[in-house]
Each structure stands twice: as structure tokens, then as C-alpha cells.
């Protein structure tokens, strides 16, 4: 391919005549030696691997490395090369064993020569003469001229070439039959003539018929000429003519099904499924055309909003398709509730009429067709349930009768970026339409560096994780971004666009220009009301965005984002280590949950200071090991996962700060995490993890000695104990959050517990 087989390389031209002494066994040995010298993970282009091959290691018997290389070049020219060298050698082995099999059948020395076509006979006869007359012409130009000359030949002269061709063709067929008798082993994949032929599609039936007609008029036409002539005619056929071939295809398919069922009974060893027999030969468009002519009713719009849009769009042929739905949505909002209710009733009536007509249509069909239509209706209903109306974003304001909800916009990194930059671009370039603005934002996104994209991808991952954690309606509500704020001019335009479109007969371009001029000529006092509305809309957007980004406290404390392979967080101090030990050994399982934690607190008070120090050292050692494992794990993450983990840690700190209230110890770390989350991921993740651990250590050290009388800490850790009792795996998953809560409660009660600890040390 690509001229490799036709143009011999320097190596081929230099091949000595001694190469003929290679036997089949020697060639197979050569390929086996090459195979043994291939790299274990061979995935490069074959030329690359071939250039690195050590041919001296391939050499065997009295064949040197150079001889082996030359022979390989000769063999490799006989097989396709768009593969790895490993695959190529396997194919070469097959070629050496069966050099004349399959596609290489015509290369067998005994294979009869095919006769030249009438046109090619004429071409070979006249080419030399025309080449002398026009030496400046290329082969391509000569071919074009001779092709034109042949078409202009009278039928009598053409007949001479046709008769010579037919005579030689008969001789070729006799020689071919003789060749097949002499070489039966070379004829592979003989067609099983007893298997019924598969039914044709309507287009195939039409093409076969038209081809016969065309060849009667032009018997010397090539296959390419027939295809070029008939190629586009099928799509230009009228529905009535196409329906004729659809009916013929259906009749042929029924006959095929009956014949195939009889055939399968006679040949039970064949593994042919019922689905393979009954597979339709019609396309979706052809099936719909047939159903339409059979009287199948057209499905009505699914809701009142869709019905309104369908009626409005019939008069909006001049409006660009990208703007039609926007205009429909704006017009729908301007309708009164009474008008919307009228459309709702009209839609319900259309649905009832459709059901009656569909039942009549089904009665006229055979049972198999009834099942097919009912199946299609079921699938349509499933799909339509997900198709919602963009008109009723606030059902409480419109009574909930104006149609279904607007489909949610997909939460993606590019979408978050677009929403963030859209308002700024609208102010900088007000002349751009919505579609032009969207294209510009897409180009801006593509030009962003990977580091900057990672920031938005992290926010995407956080949003998706939040939507997965939230149940039911809350998940749906928070899983999408709030509607972007509108400018004062946009709010004013929405309120008056109906009047302007009516004035300019639905010419949207003229209406927009007129509105723009009116707005520019308005006094500031007149604009003030709309500016206030825009400011309120901006506040609404910022409020909804902050609510969406900030995870709810209850959800954050009960569930956490899971990262595969993240090391398990160890106890933060000696008291937690002591509690974990008692809870895990099952010694206190007979006690209720609260009593169990009280018992742990009392036991902690009773142990000596040296034992407490022992547990503290164990906790510190586990913390050191945890830091090492965490660093290794963070480095092993992909850039996207690392950014998502960083975003999660930052959000977790913010939420914990809100829960704790003002904390002088954590204020520095909180501010640091805020600044880190706003940068473009240029800091090292290891430093962030160390900051997090330092914060945890501070909380742990301050609360360690005060853990003996901290009842709130005991209640927090009781969650861990309960999970340990019911399921050890749940304990592992939620332990991190429990420990954070322990730190919080222990930190808040450190002042009260310090007196208890001092009295305990005095008693000791």
C-alpha cells in the first residue's frame, strides 16, 4: 500500500540471485527467529521495530544477517503493513504456507488470464498513435481523450471490440473451470447455494431493476458509470413510487421468513436466531412513510407549551432556527394564565382524539404489526417524559398549568466557565448575538491552559459529587447552575418584544434594532426601574450561586466524597486511639451506645499518665505513617483527580469553619485554603496536605488531655462505635468525618476539660 509494493526499495534491487535457494522451511525458520527477537510489548509501527531489529541475532544456518534482512523485505512486500511487526509476521507465515490462496488466487502461474474489456482493447490499440501525435500530454489526459473517442464510436465499430471480448470471455470461463478442477485446495469459502438468499431493502430492489434497464440501453457501461447515474435518483423519488418498492420489500421478507423456517427445521445444526430471520429491511423513514399511507395518526405535542410553539413556528419561517425557541419561550411568558389554560385544554383534546384514531389504526393491522406499533408508542412515551418545557421555571407563580419543567442544563467544566464569563462579554461586546457569544466562549475555553481548565473541572467534579449525595428534589435543584443574571435592557426587551414583533410582522431583526434605538433614547429616569430589577436579578444569581456552592452542614457531616485508594485517617490523639481500641475489640458491645461512650471516658480517667502517654505516642506514629502514605497517594493521582481532591479539602475546611464559629487557631488556615482555591492550581498539593495535617494536629493536641470528661466528644465517637458494631467497612468509610467532629467538640470543650485533667494528674 502507498506504493510500497509497486516501488522496490534499494534492498530489493540489490537482492542477489542466490536468494532463490530459500526453501519454504527456511523462510518459516526466518520468521520464527524474527518473532523470537521481538520486544515483549510490541506496539510500535512495524517500520520502527524493523529498523531496531538486530539481524545478526536472526541469522541461522549459512544465512547471514544481511541475507535474512533482504529475504524479509521480499516477503513483507506480499502482505499489508498497517499493523505491528508481530501481526505482520503471523500474516507472512500464512503467506509462505499458502502463497496463492484467497486474494492472491490470480497470481498463481496456472490461473487463466482475464480478457480485456471492449473499451480497454480500443485504448491499447490507439494509445501509441495518440501518444506520438500529442507527446506533451500526460497519461491522464490521453485516457480522457480516448475515453471520449470510444463513446463517440458508431455501434458497428464498437461491435468489433465487443465480439472479440465475448469470444475471449467464453474461452476464459472454460480455462477457469479447468483450473478449479486441477486446484480444488485453492478455492476457499465456496458459497453455500442451498442457504436462501437474504431479502433486499427497497432501495436495493429499485437499484437492481433500474440497473437492468440502464444496461439494456448501454450494455458497455461500467459499474461506476451505473452507480454515478443512479446514485442520487432514489432520494429524488416521489413518496408514491418509493412506497411501491417498500411493499415489494415487505412481500419478499415474508417469503424469506417462511423459507428460512423450513430450512432451519431441515438443518437444526445451524445456529440461526429468530431475530436474524425477522429483522426488518426498512429504514425508520421508510417505516414512517408506510405507516402514514396506512393511516397512522400523527402524534400530538406532549404539552401545552409544545403546542403553542408548534403554532407559533408555522409563522416564523424568516426567523433563524437558533432563535425560534428563545422567541417562543419569551412569547409564552407574556401570555396570561387564562390563555395558557386554553392551550392546556386544547392539548388534552388533541391527545384524546389521537388515542381514538390510534385505536382505529391498530384494528386495521395484523397482530404482529399491532405489537410493533404499541412498542414504538411505549418507547416514545418514555422519551417524552424526559422532554420538558422551558416555559415554567417558576410553577408557583404561574399556577403549575403552563407546561412541564425546563430541561436541566448539563453541569460541565466548559458550561461553568461560560456562565462565569458570559455577562462580562455581553457588556464588552453588546453587538454579538447569543449564538455568536456561545461560539466565542467555546473558542476561549479551547484556548485555556490545562492548569486553568483544571480549576473548572474541579468545580464540575464537586458539583456532580454534591448532586449525587443529595436526595430527591434537593439533588435536582442543586445539580444545575442558577439562571444567569439579565441586564436592564434585556429585562425591558422581554416585556415589550411582543408589541415590537407585532408592529414589524415578526421580523425579529427589525424589532431588535427598533428596541435598541428606543432604549438608547430613553431618559435615565425611565430606565431606573429596569436597572433596579437588573440589580435584584444580580443579587438573586449571586445568592443562588453561593447556596449551590456551599454544601449543607448536615450533609457534609454525615457523608463524604469518596476517593479510590485514599489512605484511612488514623486517630488524632491518645484518647481517640484508646476509644478505637476498646470499640474494635468488642469488649463493650453489651452496653447501649451512650453508656458505652461514658464507660470509655471513665476508663480513660482511671488509667495512669504513663499509659496516656503511650496511647499518645501510638497516635503520633500512625499520624506520621498516614502523612507519608497520603503524600504518595496524592502524587499518584491524575491532574484532574488531584484538582478535585484539592477542591474537596478546601470546601471541607470552609464548612468546618462555619460549624465551629470564630476560631483563632483555624482562621489562618481557613484564609490560606480560600486563597488556594481561588488560584489556578499552581501550588504544590503536598504543601496543602501538610497544612491540613498541621491543623488537625493542633486540634488533636489541644483536645487530647481534655478528652476524659468531654461528653460531646463521646457522643460524636459513638457514631463510630455504632458503625463498628454493625459493619466494619462503614466504620472505615466514615471515620474521617467522625474524627473531624471529635476535634471540633474536643476543641470547644478544651477549657472545661483542662481542670478535670489537672485534678486527674493530682490524684495520680
From Swiss-Prot:
Molecular function, one GO term: scaffold protein binding
- Record key words, sorted: Acetylation, Activator, Disease variant, DNA-binding, Intellectual disability, Neurodegeneration, Nucleus, Phosphoprotein, Repeat, Transcription, Transcription regulation
Quaternary structure? Homodimer. Part of Pol I pre-initiation complex (PIC), in which Pol I core assembles with RRN3 and promoter-bound UTBF and SL1/TIF-IB complex. Interacts with TOP2A in the context of Pol I complex. Interacts with TBP. Interacts with TAF1A. Interacts with RASL11A. Binds to IRS1 and PIK3CA. Interacts with DHX33. Interacts with PHF6. Interacts with CEBPA (isoform 1 and isoform 4). Interacts with DDX11. Interacts with NOP53. Interacts with ALKBH2.
Disulfide pairings: none
Q: What protein is this chain from? A: Nucleolar transcription factor 1
User: From the UniProt annotation, which stretches of this protein bind DNA?
Assistant: 112-180, 196-264, 298-362, 407-475, 482-549, 568-634
Q: Where is the composition biased (Acidic residues)?
A: 677-745
Region entry Disordered, spans: 1-21, 381-411, 459-487, 546-576, 648-764
Query: Which residues does this entry mark as bearing Phosphothreonine?
Result: 201
Bias regions of kind Low complexity — which residues? 746-758
Query: Compositionally biased, Polar residues: which spans?
Result: 664-674
GO BP, sorted A to Z: positive regulation of transcription by RNA polymerase I; transcription by RNA polymerase I; transcription initiation at RNA polymerase I promoter
Please tell me, according to the UniProt entry, what happens when changing residue 210 to K: In CONDBA; increased RNA polymerase I core element sequence-specific DNA binding; increased transcription from RNA polymerase I promoter
* Native source organism of the sequence: Homo sapiens (Human)
Location in or out of the cell: Nucleus, Nucleolus
| Superkingdom of origin organism | Eukaryota
**Post-translational modification summary for this protein:** Phosphorylated and activated by PIK3CA.
Q: Which PROSITE patterns match?
A: HMG_BOX_2 (PS50118)
Q: Which PANTHER family match?
A: NUCLEOLAR TRANSCRIPTION FACTOR 1, UPSTREAM BINDING TRANSCRIPTION FACTOR
Q: Which Gene3D superfamilies has this protein been placed in?
A: High mobility group box domain (1.10.30.10)
Q: Is Transferase set as a keyword in this record?
A: no
Chain's gene name: UBTF
Q: Briefly, what is this protein's role?
A: Recognizes the ribosomal RNA gene promoter and activates transcription mediated by RNA polymerase I (Pol I) through cooperative interactions with the transcription factor SL1/TIF-IB complex. It binds specifically to the upstream control element and can activate Pol I promoter escape.
Q: List modified residues, type Phosphoserine.
A: 273, 336, 364, 389, 412, 433, 435, 484, 495, 546, 584, 638
Question: Is Oxidoreductase a UniProt keyword of this protein?
Answer: no
Please give the GO cellular component terms listed in this UniProt entry: fibrillar center; nucleolus; nucleoplasm; nucleus
Task: Provide the disease association from the record.
Answer: Neurodegeneration, childhood-onset, with brain atrophy: An autosomal dominant neurodegenerative disease with onset in childhood, characterized by progressive cortical atrophy, developmental delay, developmental regression, loss of motor skills and ambulation, absence of language, and intellectual disability.
